[in-house]
């Protein structure tokens, strides 16, 4: 099993938190100190927690389970889409639509519409329409693809969420909590770890840090799938209860 090391995290700047005045006291036990009014995250705590999360994801993937990658803010979206595509996982990189998990039946209908429009665009149907109607359908297709393109092949609810910036994606986490779906999340010093089953204390803004988290998670999914291909029998453990997060 390939694991991330301290040097990787330092090079990526995972230890840089937010300004001290914006800190969340619930993250206090993961803070090493402060430098120039910026909180420094204790990577000696982060590293084993990150590797534990990677092990969990690898075990899930080995059981053919689906991990949904979520990162919709500007610094995360492109990386989330690229790494999710690399490992064949569903993702949300543009905007989290309310009810994406808790009202999946309705979302499924929108995905069906997306697929219909994709077929029409390919089979020449658009070319037979009036210019105005073709333009309207093209816009609908682009809008649906931007919102749902990353989950159109998910097939059903995911078995876990991996979230970059838990404050920014709080709606997604709340929906996952309601459905009992385990949440793995990168939690910065200004955020609350509430509702996150696998906490990864770390910088959730720096592109190099996001690349490290996402690349490592994608690698874990690929390793897990390879275990299945190789006939390895791997046990999937349950996520620790979110209630275990200390206030």
Swiss-Prot record:
Which keywords does UniProt give here? Ribonucleoprotein, Ribosomal protein
One Gene Ontology biological process: translation
User: Can you list the disulfide-bonded cysteine pairs?
Assistant: none
Q: What stretch or stretches form a coiled coil here? A: none
**Pfam families, alphabetically?**
Ribosomal_S2
Q: Does the keyword Protease apply?
A: no
Q: Name one GO molecular function term.
A: structural constituent of ribosome
Identify the domain of life: Bacteria
Could you tell me which Gene3D superfamilies the record lists for this protein? Glucose-6-phosphate isomerase like protein, domain 1 (3.40.50.10490), Helix hairpin bin (1.10.287.610)
Task: Quote the HAMAP family the UniProt record gives.
Answer: Ribosomal_uS2_B (MF_00291_B)
**Family in the record:** Belongs to the universal ribosomal protein uS2 family.
Q: What is this protein called?
A: Small ribosomal subunit protein uS2
The protein's organism comes out as Pseudomonas syringae pv. syringae (strain B728a)
Q: Taxonomic lineage of this organism?
A: Bacteria, Pseudomonadati, Pseudomonadota, Gammaproteobacteria, Pseudomonadales
Protein's gene: rpsB
């Amino acid at each position: 099993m390939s694991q991330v090391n301290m040097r990787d995290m330092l090079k990526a700047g995972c230890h840089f938190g937010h300004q001290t005045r914006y800190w969340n006291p619930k993250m206090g036990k993961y803070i090493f100190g402060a430098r120039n009014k910026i909180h420094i995250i204790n990577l000696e705590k982060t590293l084993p927690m990150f590797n534990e999360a990677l092990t969990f994801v690898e075990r899930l993937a080995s059981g053919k389970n689906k991990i949904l990658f979520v990162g919709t803010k500007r610094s995360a979206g492109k990386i989330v889409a690229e790494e999710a595509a690399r490992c064949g996982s569903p993702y949300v990189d543009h905007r989290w639509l309310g009810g994406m998990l808790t009202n999946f039946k309705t979302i499924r209908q929108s995905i069906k519409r997306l697929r219909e429009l994709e077929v029409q665009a390919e089979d020449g149907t658009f070319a037979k329409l009036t210019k105005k109607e073709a333009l309207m359908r093209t816009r609908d297709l682009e809008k649906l693809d931007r919102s749902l393109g990353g989950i159109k092949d998910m097939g059903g609810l995911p078995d876990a969420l991996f979230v970059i910036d838990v404050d920014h994606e709080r709606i997604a986490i709340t929906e996952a909590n309601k459905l009992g779906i385990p949440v793995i999340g990168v939690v910065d010093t200004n955020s609350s770890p509430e509702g996150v089953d696998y906490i990864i204390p770390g910088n959730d803004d720096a592109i190099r840090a996001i690349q490290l988290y996402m690349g490592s998670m994608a690698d874990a999914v690929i390793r897990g799938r390879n275990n299945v291909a190789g006939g390895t029998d791997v046990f999937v453990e349950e996520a620790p209860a979110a209630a275990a997060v200390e206030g």
